Amino acid sequence: MNLHEYQAKQLFEHYGLPVKNGAVCQSVDEVDLVLAQLSGDKWAAKCQVHAGGRGKAGGVKLVQDVEEARSFAEKWLGQRLVTFQTDKLGQPVNQIYFEETCDIDKEFYLSAVVDRASQKVVFIASPAGGMDIEEVAQNTPHLLHKVEIDPLFGGLPYQGRELAFKLGLSDAQNKQFTDIFMGLSRLFLEKDLSLVEVNPLVLTQQGNLVCLDAKIAVDDNALFRHKDLSALQDLTQNDAREAEAEKFQLNYVALEGDIGCMVNGAGLAMGTMDIVKLYGGKPANFLDVGGGATKERVAEAFKIILTDPSVKVILVNIFGGIVRCDLIAEGVIAAVNEVGVRVPVVVRLEGTNAEIGRQILAESDVNILTAQSLQQATELAVNAAKENSNGDFN
Protein backbone atom coordinates (compact mmCIF):
# COMPACT_ATOMS: atom_id res chain seq x y z
CA MET A 1 0.00 0.00 0.00
CA ASN A 2 1.38 3.38 -1.02
CA LEU A 3 1.08 6.58 0.98
CA HIS A 4 0.85 10.13 -0.33
CA GLU A 5 3.80 12.42 0.25
CA TYR A 6 2.01 14.48 2.90
CA GLN A 7 1.09 11.29 4.79
CA ALA A 8 4.67 10.02 4.58
CA LYS A 9 5.98 13.32 5.95
CA GLN A 10 3.61 13.12 8.89
CA LEU A 11 5.28 9.79 9.71
CA PHE A 12 8.70 11.36 9.17
CA GLU A 13 7.87 14.06 11.70
CA HIS A 14 6.72 11.45 14.20
CA TYR A 15 10.12 9.77 13.92
CA GLY A 16 12.03 13.03 14.31
CA LEU A 17 13.11 13.40 10.69
CA PRO A 18 13.66 16.94 9.36
CA VAL A 19 10.92 18.08 6.96
CA LYS A 20 9.62 21.50 5.93
CA ASN A 21 6.26 22.70 7.21
CA GLY A 22 3.42 21.87 4.85
CA ALA A 23 -0.34 21.57 4.60
CA VAL A 24 -2.75 19.91 2.20
CA CYS A 25 -5.88 21.24 0.49
CA GLN A 26 -8.67 19.41 -1.31
CA SER A 27 -10.40 22.38 -2.93
CA VAL A 28 -9.44 25.76 -4.35
CA ASP A 29 -11.36 27.48 -1.55
CA GLU A 30 -8.97 25.96 1.00
CA VAL A 31 -5.81 27.38 -0.60
CA ASP A 32 -5.84 30.70 1.28
CA LEU A 33 -6.43 28.97 4.62
CA VAL A 34 -3.66 26.45 3.97
CA LEU A 35 -1.09 29.06 2.97
CA ALA A 36 -1.94 31.14 6.04
CA GLN A 37 -0.54 28.27 8.11
CA LEU A 38 2.83 28.47 6.34
CA SER A 39 5.62 31.03 6.49
CA GLY A 40 7.47 32.59 3.57
CA ASP A 41 6.33 34.33 0.42
CA LYS A 42 6.66 31.38 -1.96
CA TRP A 43 5.83 27.71 -1.64
CA ALA A 44 6.22 24.37 -3.40
CA ALA A 45 2.88 23.11 -4.76
CA LYS A 46 2.74 19.35 -5.28
CA CYS A 47 0.02 17.16 -6.76
CA GLN A 48 -0.62 14.17 -4.50
CA VAL A 49 -0.67 10.97 -6.55
CA HIS A 50 0.81 7.50 -6.03
CA ALA A 51 3.41 7.86 -8.77
CA GLY A 52 6.87 9.27 -9.31
CA GLY A 53 7.89 11.66 -12.05
CA ARG A 54 5.48 14.39 -10.92
CA GLY A 55 7.98 17.18 -11.49
CA LYS A 56 8.65 16.31 -15.12
CA ALA A 57 4.90 16.01 -15.74
CA GLY A 58 4.14 19.47 -14.36
CA GLY A 59 2.68 18.21 -11.10
CA VAL A 60 5.17 20.12 -8.94
CA LYS A 61 5.62 23.88 -9.16
CA LEU A 62 7.17 26.71 -7.17
CA VAL A 63 4.36 29.26 -6.68
CA GLN A 64 5.29 32.86 -5.93
CA ASP A 65 2.04 34.11 -4.40
CA VAL A 66 -1.48 33.12 -3.35
CA GLU A 67 -2.96 33.78 -6.78
CA GLU A 68 -0.45 31.50 -8.47
CA ALA A 69 -1.17 28.87 -5.83
CA ARG A 70 -4.91 29.11 -6.49
CA SER A 71 -4.26 28.89 -10.24
CA PHE A 72 -2.21 25.71 -9.75
CA ALA A 73 -4.96 24.17 -7.62
CA GLU A 74 -7.64 25.12 -10.18
CA LYS A 75 -5.57 23.51 -12.93
CA TRP A 76 -4.98 20.18 -11.22
CA LEU A 77 -7.67 19.38 -8.65
CA GLY A 78 -10.11 16.92 -10.17
CA GLN A 79 -7.79 16.20 -13.10
CA ARG A 80 -5.50 13.24 -13.81
CA LEU A 81 -1.72 13.45 -13.78
CA VAL A 82 0.13 11.30 -16.31
CA THR A 83 3.77 10.46 -15.54
CA PHE A 84 6.21 7.86 -16.81
CA GLN A 85 5.13 5.65 -13.90
CA THR A 86 1.38 5.74 -14.65
CA ASP A 87 -0.66 4.32 -17.50
CA LYS A 88 -1.94 6.58 -20.26
CA LEU A 89 -4.95 7.61 -18.16
CA GLY A 90 -2.82 8.81 -15.25
CA GLN A 91 -3.97 9.08 -11.64
CA PRO A 92 -6.54 11.44 -10.11
CA VAL A 93 -5.37 14.54 -8.25
CA ASN A 94 -7.60 15.01 -5.20
CA GLN A 95 -5.16 16.91 -2.97
CA ILE A 96 -2.49 19.57 -3.41
CA TYR A 97 0.31 19.70 -0.85
CA PHE A 98 1.80 23.15 -0.21
CA GLU A 99 5.18 23.27 1.50
CA GLU A 100 7.60 25.91 2.69
CA THR A 101 10.72 26.25 0.55
CA CYS A 102 14.42 26.24 1.40
CA ASP A 103 17.66 27.35 -0.25
CA ILE A 104 19.24 24.21 -1.68
CA ASP A 105 22.99 23.75 -1.85
CA LYS A 106 23.18 20.03 -2.77
CA GLU A 107 20.77 17.18 -3.47
CA PHE A 108 21.22 13.58 -2.34
CA TYR A 109 19.26 10.36 -2.68
CA LEU A 110 18.39 8.02 0.18
CA SER A 111 16.12 4.97 0.22
CA ALA A 112 15.57 1.60 1.88
CA VAL A 113 14.09 -1.55 0.37
CA VAL A 114 13.73 -5.21 1.28
CA ASP A 115 16.39 -7.35 -0.41
CA ARG A 116 14.96 -10.86 -0.56
CA ALA A 117 18.26 -12.35 -1.71
CA SER A 118 20.11 -11.31 1.45
CA GLN A 119 16.96 -11.35 3.62
CA LYS A 120 17.88 -7.92 4.88
CA VAL A 121 16.90 -4.30 4.45
CA VAL A 122 19.21 -2.44 2.09
CA PHE A 123 19.80 1.31 2.39
CA ILE A 124 20.85 3.04 -0.81
CA ALA A 125 22.44 6.50 -0.85
CA SER A 126 23.78 8.61 -3.70
CA PRO A 127 25.33 12.07 -4.08
CA ALA A 128 23.29 12.42 -7.29
CA GLY A 129 19.76 12.98 -5.99
CA GLY A 130 16.84 14.66 -7.68
CA MET A 131 14.46 13.74 -10.44
CA ASP A 132 16.92 11.72 -12.55
CA ILE A 133 17.93 9.02 -10.06
CA GLU A 134 16.74 6.35 -12.52
CA GLU A 135 19.33 7.54 -15.03
CA VAL A 136 21.99 7.58 -12.32
CA ALA A 137 21.24 3.95 -11.50
CA GLN A 138 21.48 2.97 -15.16
CA ASN A 139 24.41 5.07 -16.33
CA THR A 140 26.55 5.63 -13.22
CA PRO A 141 25.85 2.80 -10.76
CA HIS A 142 29.14 3.52 -8.97
CA LEU A 143 27.43 6.58 -7.49
CA LEU A 144 25.02 4.32 -5.57
CA HIS A 145 26.28 3.28 -2.13
CA LYS A 146 24.61 0.49 -0.14
CA VAL A 147 24.58 -0.93 3.37
CA GLU A 148 22.62 -3.95 4.60
CA ILE A 149 20.51 -3.73 7.76
CA ASP A 150 19.85 -6.84 9.80
CA PRO A 151 16.12 -6.70 10.66
CA LEU A 152 16.86 -8.20 14.10
CA PHE A 153 19.13 -5.31 15.12
CA GLY A 154 18.05 -2.44 12.86
CA GLY A 155 20.34 0.26 11.56
CA LEU A 156 23.53 0.91 13.52
CA PRO A 157 25.14 4.36 13.83
CA TYR A 158 28.41 3.29 12.21
CA GLN A 159 26.47 2.31 9.07
CA GLY A 160 24.97 5.78 8.86
CA ARG A 161 28.42 7.34 9.29
CA GLU A 162 29.78 5.04 6.57
CA LEU A 163 27.17 6.29 4.08
CA ALA A 164 27.68 9.91 5.15
CA PHE A 165 31.42 9.58 4.53
CA LYS A 166 30.79 8.18 1.04
CA LEU A 167 28.48 11.12 0.31
CA GLY A 168 31.25 13.56 1.24
CA LEU A 169 29.41 15.19 4.13
CA SER A 170 31.17 17.29 6.79
CA ASP A 171 31.43 16.19 10.43
CA ALA A 172 28.39 18.26 11.45
CA GLN A 173 26.35 16.96 8.54
CA ASN A 174 27.57 13.44 9.28
CA LYS A 175 25.79 13.62 12.64
CA GLN A 176 22.59 14.90 10.98
CA PHE A 177 22.70 12.20 8.32
CA THR A 178 23.26 9.45 10.89
CA ASP A 179 20.23 10.66 12.85
CA ILE A 180 18.14 10.57 9.66
CA PHE A 181 19.47 7.11 8.81
CA MET A 182 18.61 5.77 12.26
CA GLY A 183 15.14 7.34 12.16
CA LEU A 184 14.37 5.85 8.77
CA SER A 185 15.61 2.46 9.94
CA ARG A 186 13.27 2.52 12.94
CA LEU A 187 10.38 3.69 10.78
CA PHE A 188 11.02 0.99 8.18
CA LEU A 189 11.11 -1.87 10.66
CA GLU A 190 8.46 -0.72 13.13
CA LYS A 191 5.89 0.03 10.43
CA ASP A 192 6.66 -3.01 8.23
CA LEU A 193 7.51 -0.97 5.16
CA SER A 194 8.58 -2.39 1.82
CA LEU A 195 10.00 0.93 0.57
CA VAL A 196 10.97 4.31 1.95
CA GLU A 197 12.54 6.88 -0.35
CA VAL A 198 13.79 10.43 0.16
CA ASN A 199 14.51 12.03 -3.20
CA PRO A 200 15.89 14.52 -2.78
CA LEU A 201 17.47 14.69 0.63
CA VAL A 202 18.83 18.23 0.42
CA LEU A 203 21.64 20.11 2.08
CA THR A 204 20.52 23.70 2.59
CA GLN A 205 22.80 26.71 2.27
CA GLN A 206 22.62 26.95 6.06
CA GLY A 207 24.24 23.49 6.30
CA ASN A 208 21.17 21.52 7.36
CA LEU A 209 19.83 18.29 5.87
CA VAL A 210 16.10 18.25 5.00
CA CYS A 211 13.87 15.49 3.62
CA LEU A 212 12.38 17.45 0.73
CA ASP A 213 10.34 14.56 -0.66
CA ALA A 214 9.03 11.36 0.89
CA LYS A 215 7.73 8.12 -0.54
CA ILE A 216 6.49 5.19 1.54
CA ALA A 217 5.10 1.77 0.60
CA VAL A 218 3.71 -0.48 3.33
CA ASP A 219 3.78 -4.27 3.13
CA ASP A 220 0.15 -5.25 2.45
CA ASN A 221 0.61 -8.45 4.44
CA ALA A 222 1.33 -6.41 7.59
CA LEU A 223 -1.58 -3.99 7.41
CA PHE A 224 -3.61 -6.07 9.86
CA ARG A 225 -1.31 -4.89 12.65
CA HIS A 226 -1.10 -1.27 11.50
CA LYS A 227 -4.67 -0.02 11.58
CA ASP A 228 -3.40 3.56 11.66
CA LEU A 229 -1.66 3.09 8.31
CA SER A 230 -4.50 1.08 6.79
CA ALA A 231 -6.81 4.04 7.48
CA LEU A 232 -4.59 6.21 5.26
CA GLN A 233 -5.24 4.15 2.14
CA ASP A 234 -6.50 6.23 -0.81
CA LEU A 235 -8.54 3.84 -2.95
CA THR A 236 -9.06 6.51 -5.63
CA GLN A 237 -5.43 5.95 -6.63
CA ASN A 238 -6.10 2.29 -7.42
CA ASP A 239 -7.49 1.00 -10.68
CA ALA A 240 -11.20 0.27 -10.06
CA ARG A 241 -10.77 -3.28 -11.35
CA GLU A 242 -7.77 -3.88 -9.10
CA ALA A 243 -9.75 -2.65 -6.10
CA GLU A 244 -12.65 -4.96 -7.00
CA ALA A 245 -10.26 -7.90 -7.43
CA GLU A 246 -8.87 -7.39 -3.93
CA LYS A 247 -12.32 -8.04 -2.46
CA PHE A 248 -12.20 -11.59 -3.86
CA GLN A 249 -8.50 -12.19 -3.12
CA LEU A 250 -7.62 -11.97 -6.80
CA ASN A 251 -4.31 -10.43 -7.84
CA TYR A 252 -5.15 -8.22 -10.83
CA VAL A 253 -3.08 -5.63 -12.66
CA ALA A 254 -4.56 -3.80 -15.64
CA LEU A 255 -2.44 -3.57 -18.80
CA GLU A 256 -3.10 -2.14 -22.25
CA GLY A 257 -3.50 -5.19 -24.51
CA ASP A 258 -6.52 -7.10 -25.83
CA ILE A 259 -5.94 -10.67 -24.55
CA GLY A 260 -7.44 -11.16 -21.10
CA CYS A 261 -5.43 -13.64 -19.02
CA MET A 262 -6.67 -15.75 -16.10
CA VAL A 263 -3.96 -17.90 -14.52
CA ASN A 264 -3.28 -19.58 -11.18
CA GLY A 265 0.09 -18.63 -9.73
CA ALA A 266 2.05 -15.41 -10.16
CA GLY A 267 5.00 -17.09 -11.87
CA LEU A 268 2.80 -18.91 -14.37
CA ALA A 269 0.86 -15.69 -14.96
CA MET A 270 4.04 -13.80 -15.82
CA GLY A 271 5.21 -16.65 -18.03
CA THR A 272 1.84 -16.64 -19.80
CA MET A 273 2.14 -12.93 -20.51
CA ASP A 274 5.66 -13.45 -21.84
CA ILE A 275 4.59 -16.16 -24.28
CA VAL A 276 1.59 -14.09 -25.40
CA LYS A 277 4.03 -11.30 -26.30
CA LEU A 278 6.36 -13.83 -27.95
CA TYR A 279 3.54 -14.95 -30.25
CA GLY A 280 2.70 -11.37 -31.22
CA GLY A 281 -0.18 -10.74 -28.82
CA LYS A 282 -0.72 -8.12 -26.12
CA PRO A 283 -1.93 -9.15 -22.65
CA ALA A 284 -4.75 -7.00 -21.29
CA ASN A 285 -4.00 -7.86 -17.68
CA PHE A 286 -2.16 -9.89 -15.10
CA LEU A 287 -4.65 -11.97 -13.11
CA ASP A 288 -3.66 -14.63 -10.59
CA VAL A 289 -6.67 -16.48 -9.14
CA GLY A 290 -4.40 -18.21 -6.61
CA GLY A 291 -4.21 -21.79 -5.45
CA GLY A 292 -7.65 -21.84 -3.84
CA ALA A 293 -9.64 -20.99 -6.94
CA THR A 294 -13.37 -21.66 -6.60
CA LYS A 295 -16.28 -21.39 -9.02
CA GLU A 296 -17.21 -18.08 -7.43
CA ARG A 297 -13.72 -16.63 -7.76
CA VAL A 298 -13.41 -17.81 -11.36
CA ALA A 299 -16.74 -16.11 -12.15
CA GLU A 300 -15.58 -12.89 -10.51
CA ALA A 301 -12.30 -13.10 -12.43
CA PHE A 302 -14.24 -13.28 -15.71
CA LYS A 303 -16.38 -10.31 -14.68
CA ILE A 304 -13.34 -8.21 -13.84
CA ILE A 305 -11.53 -9.10 -17.07
CA LEU A 306 -14.60 -8.23 -19.12
CA THR A 307 -14.95 -4.78 -17.56
CA ASP A 308 -12.07 -3.89 -19.87
CA PRO A 309 -13.74 -3.06 -23.21
CA SER A 310 -10.51 -3.69 -25.12
CA VAL A 311 -10.52 -7.44 -24.30
CA LYS A 312 -11.17 -9.49 -27.45
CA VAL A 313 -10.38 -12.96 -26.11
CA ILE A 314 -9.82 -14.60 -22.72
CA LEU A 315 -6.95 -17.04 -22.22
CA VAL A 316 -7.35 -19.35 -19.20
CA ASN A 317 -4.12 -21.13 -18.26
CA ILE A 318 -4.39 -23.43 -15.23
CA PHE A 319 -1.85 -25.82 -13.76
CA GLY A 320 -3.66 -28.06 -11.30
CA GLY A 321 -1.55 -28.60 -8.23
CA ILE A 322 -3.48 -27.41 -5.22
CA VAL A 323 -6.53 -26.71 -7.35
CA ARG A 324 -8.23 -29.47 -9.39
CA CYS A 325 -8.69 -28.90 -13.11
CA ASP A 326 -12.17 -30.44 -13.13
CA LEU A 327 -13.34 -27.84 -10.62
CA ILE A 328 -11.79 -25.09 -12.72
CA ALA A 329 -13.56 -26.44 -15.81
CA GLU A 330 -16.89 -26.37 -13.99
CA GLY A 331 -16.12 -22.86 -12.79
CA VAL A 332 -15.28 -21.67 -16.30
CA ILE A 333 -18.53 -23.09 -17.70
CA ALA A 334 -20.57 -21.58 -14.87
CA ALA A 335 -18.83 -18.23 -15.29
CA VAL A 336 -19.36 -18.11 -19.04
CA ASN A 337 -23.06 -18.85 -18.58
CA GLU A 338 -23.49 -16.46 -15.65
CA VAL A 339 -21.54 -13.54 -17.03
CA GLY A 340 -22.69 -13.94 -20.62
CA VAL A 341 -19.22 -13.91 -22.13
CA ARG A 342 -19.33 -12.68 -25.73
CA VAL A 343 -15.66 -13.05 -26.59
CA PRO A 344 -13.79 -16.27 -27.42
CA VAL A 345 -12.50 -18.23 -24.42
CA VAL A 346 -9.38 -20.39 -24.78
CA VAL A 347 -8.64 -22.85 -21.96
CA ARG A 348 -5.48 -24.82 -21.28
CA LEU A 349 -5.59 -27.25 -18.35
CA GLU A 350 -2.66 -29.28 -17.04
CA GLY A 351 -2.06 -31.19 -13.83
CA THR A 352 -4.51 -32.76 -11.36
CA ASN A 353 -7.62 -34.11 -13.17
CA ALA A 354 -6.65 -32.26 -16.36
CA GLU A 355 -8.18 -34.95 -18.62
CA ILE A 356 -11.43 -34.88 -16.67
CA GLY A 357 -11.45 -31.09 -16.91
CA ARG A 358 -10.94 -31.13 -20.66
CA GLN A 359 -13.71 -33.73 -21.03
CA ILE A 360 -16.10 -31.57 -19.01
CA LEU A 361 -15.35 -28.61 -21.30
CA ALA A 362 -15.75 -30.73 -24.45
CA GLU A 363 -19.12 -32.12 -23.34
CA SER A 364 -20.53 -28.74 -22.35
CA ASP A 365 -22.71 -26.67 -24.67
CA VAL A 366 -20.50 -23.62 -24.11
CA ASN A 367 -18.36 -22.34 -26.97
CA ILE A 368 -14.90 -22.80 -25.44
CA LEU A 369 -11.67 -23.54 -27.29
CA THR A 370 -9.52 -26.13 -25.49
CA ALA A 371 -5.78 -26.54 -25.98
CA GLN A 372 -3.38 -29.37 -25.17
CA SER A 373 -0.38 -27.10 -24.59
CA LEU A 374 0.40 -23.52 -23.64
CA GLN A 375 1.85 -22.89 -27.09
CA GLN A 376 -1.34 -24.07 -28.78
CA ALA A 377 -3.48 -22.05 -26.37
CA THR A 378 -1.44 -18.93 -27.04
CA GLU A 379 -1.68 -19.34 -30.81
CA LEU A 380 -5.46 -19.79 -30.56
CA ALA A 381 -5.80 -16.71 -28.34
CA VAL A 382 -3.59 -14.48 -30.48
CA ASN A 383 -5.38 -15.52 -33.69
CA ALA A 384 -8.79 -15.06 -32.05
CA ALA A 385 -7.83 -11.56 -30.90
CA LYS A 386 -6.82 -10.61 -34.43
CA GLU A 387 -10.01 -12.01 -35.96
CA ASN A 388 -12.40 -10.84 -33.27
CA SER A 389 -11.90 -7.12 -33.63
CA ASN A 390 -15.53 -6.36 -32.75
CA GLY A 391 -15.42 -8.44 -29.55
CA ASP A 392 -18.16 -10.92 -30.62
CA PHE A 393 -18.04 -14.57 -31.57
CA ASN A 394 -17.87 -15.21 -35.30
Curated annotation (Swiss-Prot):
Keyword flag Magnesium: yes
One GO-annotated biological process of the protein: tricarboxylic acid cycle
Binding site for Mg(2+): N199, D213
Cofactor binding note: Binds 1 Mg(2+) ion per subunit.
Cofactor: Mg(2+)
Entry GO CC: cytosol; succinate-CoA ligase complex
PROSITE patterns registered for this protein in UniProt: SUCCINYL_COA_LIG_3
Domain of life: Bacteria
Enzyme class at the top of the EC tree: ligase
UniProt entry keywords in alphabetical sequence: ATP-binding, Ligase, Magnesium, Metal-binding, Nucleotide-binding, Tricarboxylic acid cycle
Residues that hold substrate according to the record: N264, G321, I322, V323
Chain's role: Succinyl-CoA synthetase functions in the citric acid cycle (TCA), coupling the hydrolysis of succinyl-CoA to the synthesis of either ATP or GTP and thus represents the only step of substrate-level phosphorylation in the TCA. The beta subunit provides nucleotide specificity of the enzyme and binds the substrate succinate, while the binding sites for coenzyme A and phosphate are found in the alpha subunit.
Full protein name: Succinate--CoA ligase [ADP-forming] subunit beta
Designated gene of the protein: sucC
